[in-house]
Curated annotation (Swiss-Prot):
Subcellular location: Plastid, Chloroplast
Protein name according to UniProt: DNA-directed RNA polymerase subunit alpha
Keyword Plastid appears in the UniProt entry: yes
Subunit structure: In plastids the minimal PEP RNA polymerase catalytic core is composed of four subunits: alpha, beta, beta', and beta''. When a (nuclear-encoded) sigma factor is associated with the core the holoenzyme is formed, which can initiate transcription.
Length: 333
């Protein structure tokens, strides 16, 4: 086990592994911190990275089984202790590691008596067994068992199809999820006059990759989601004279807004891309809008006077305060 004393950076934002251990061949653990973060950022990152880790990291597993000795999934085979269903469940749990693409073939050819384990699977060169001792079946008599397998690399969870194929093959539930669990927690502290946060992230994997590798892949996936925004042409982000116009709906101070037009320099403002966090609103108004699920300037302007006054703790004079702030920051002329 590797464990380090916790030292928090006060300047540069950085990830750091503070604990790493191997509990078994199929259970790796890692604990990471990210700091320093502004208030609210830790929860944003924690939610996003957890979802990516649990749902979008690719894994490899057995997805299909075929054997002449299997009449149907809930049958038994003479000379084998486990039922066919139990064998399928054991094959489903086999942890594989690979860099393959598409679907690959594998097989088992075993003469009893004896125990069939993961090491008896004949694999393509691009696939490895993580734990050779994983149990598959106990052959109690001198019978010859031949099983053909399909191996696939994918992500998420896929439930087997209900129908069997005419060639005698059976789909099994596929769990392409090398990350077994993810927890995150947030520690708040004060640095000078500024409130900051530390994000603690715990990752458990099945041994086909380390928690550090999983975190790296999740971070890459998350970055790739935003790359189109970074490389898109400016025209895709800004309103043009005759395209993608936004009509300002009724607002608390609608009569004033009718006279004010969006500031037209070389670029027009894309209202959807302006978050209320950027407006430097008074804390009471900001919290009121957030609680009412108002996150962008467009969402703010999409509410009528009656709608806004229904928000808890929102007052008539708050509308004028918001308009004054928008004018000061030159969102309106």
């Amino acid at each position: 086990m590797v464990q380090e004393k916790l030292r928090v950076s006060t300047r540069t934002l950085q990830w750091k592994c503070v604990e790493s251990r191997i509990d078994s061949k199929r259970l790796y653990y890692g604990r990471f911190i990210l700091s320093p973060l502004m208030k609210g950022q830790a929860d944003t990152i924690g939610i996003a990275i957890r979802r990516i880790l649990l749902g979008e990291i690719e894994g490899t597993c057995i997805t299909c089984v075929k054997s002449e000795k299997i009449p149907h999934e809930y049958s038994t085979i003479i000379g084998i202790e486990e039922s066919v269903h139990e064998i399928f469940m054991n094959l489903k749990e086999i942890v594989l590691k690979s860099n393959m693409y598409g679907i690959q073939d594998a097989s088992i050819s075993f003469k009893g008596p004896g125990y069939i384990t993961a090491q008896d699977i004949i694999l393509p060169p691009s696939v490895e067994i993580v734990d050779n001792r994983q149990h598959i079946a106990n052959v109690t008599e001198p019978v010859h068992l031949c099983i053909e397998l399909k191996i696939e690399r994918n992500r998420g969870y896929r439930i087997k199809t209900l129908k069997n194929f005419q060639d005698g093959s059976y789909d099994i539930d596929a769990r392409f999820m090398p990350v077994r669990n993810v927890n995150y927690s947030i520690h708040s502290y004060v640095n000078g006059n500024e409130k900051q946060e530390i994000l603690f992230l715990e990752i458990w994997t099945n041994g086909s990759l380390t928690p550090k590798e999983a975190l790296y892949e999740a971070s890459q996936n998350l970055i790739e989601l935003f790359i189109p925004f970074l490389h898109a042409e400016e025209d895709n982000f800004h309103l043009e004279k005759n395209q993608h116009k936004v009509t300002l709906p009724l607002f608390t101070f609608h009569d004033i807004l009718v006279k004010d037009k969006l500031r037209k320099n070389q670029k027009e403002i894309a209202l959807k891309s302006i978050f209320i966090d950027q407006l430097e609103l008074p804390p009471r108004i900001y919290n009121c809008l957030k609680r009412s699920n108002i996150h962008t300037l467009l969402e703010l302007l999409s509410n009528s006077q009656e709608d806004l006054l229904k928000f808890e703790h929102f007052h008539v004079e708050d509308g004028k305060s918001i308009l004054d702030i928008l004018k000061i920051q030159k969102y309106f002329a």
